[in-house]
């Protein structure tokens, strides 16, 4: 997720921990000063409207969650110096930089969504009814066997694309009656 820096990075940002409603902790890089220089990009997330368009709720379905979704996207080495933070080890301060997309970068949602959308467009071109919101996705089919095969194809495509599914949440390779 990050790499050790020999020297102090160009920018050293505060590092915080965010806790969600289930108690899961997530490292968040406070990039408020860096974000001032990041071009603002609009991103349209899929939601209920798209789910109603693409998904068949009268058949079988599966879902997936990508483990640490943003951390699948590598940051170009020239840009990592802006994603630095420090860590105190006893009497020594050590510096690190994120080498993957961090939580806290204002363009992270746009970058991640645009990357995953390539897979979604591919699946839809094959006739797979899919909806993805950031790192969570679902698909459906009219019968169990088709849904099971679809979920295996999606799981394989995710792995071949370098994504890792969260095995604690995934239902890939399974089908559930809606």
Residue positions per predicted region:
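Short Gly/Ser/Thr- and Asp/Glu-enriched loop/turn motifs at secondary-structure junctions
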Residues: 8-12, 132-135, 168-175
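Catalytic palm active-site di-aspartate
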Residues: 30, 65-67, 102-104, 126-143, ...
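A conserved non-catalytic segment of reverse transcriptases
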Residues: 94-99, 155-178
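Juxtamembrane helix-loop transition sites at the ends of transmembrane segments
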Residues: 51, 86, 125, 156-157, ...
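Active-site palm subdomain of RNA-directed nucleic acid polymerases
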Residues: 4-6, 109-158
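Catalytic-core region of right-hand nucleic acid polymerases
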Residues: 1-113
């Amino acid at each position: 997720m990050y790499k050790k820096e020999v020297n102090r990075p160009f920018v050293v940002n505060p590092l915080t921990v965010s806790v969600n409603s289930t108690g899961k902790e997530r490292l968040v890089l406070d990039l408020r000063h860096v974000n001032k220089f990041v071009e603002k990009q609009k991103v349209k997330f899929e939601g209920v409207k798209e789910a109603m368009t693409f998904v068949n709720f009268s058949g079988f379905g599966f879902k997936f969650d990508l483990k640490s979704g943003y951390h699948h996207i590598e940051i170009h080495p020239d840009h990592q110096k802006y994603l630095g933070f420090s860590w105190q080890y006893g009497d020594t301060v050590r510096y690190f930089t994120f080498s993957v997309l961090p939580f806290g970068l204002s363009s992270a949602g746009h970058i991640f969504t645009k990357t995953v959308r390539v897979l979604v467009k591919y699946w839809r071109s094959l006739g797979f009814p899919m909806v993805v919101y950031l790192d969570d996705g679902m698909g459906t089919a009219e019968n169990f066997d088709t849904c099971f095969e679809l979920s295996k194809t999606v799981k394989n495509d995710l792995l071949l694309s370098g994504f890792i599914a969260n095995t604690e949440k995934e239902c890939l390779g399974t089908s559930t009656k809606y």
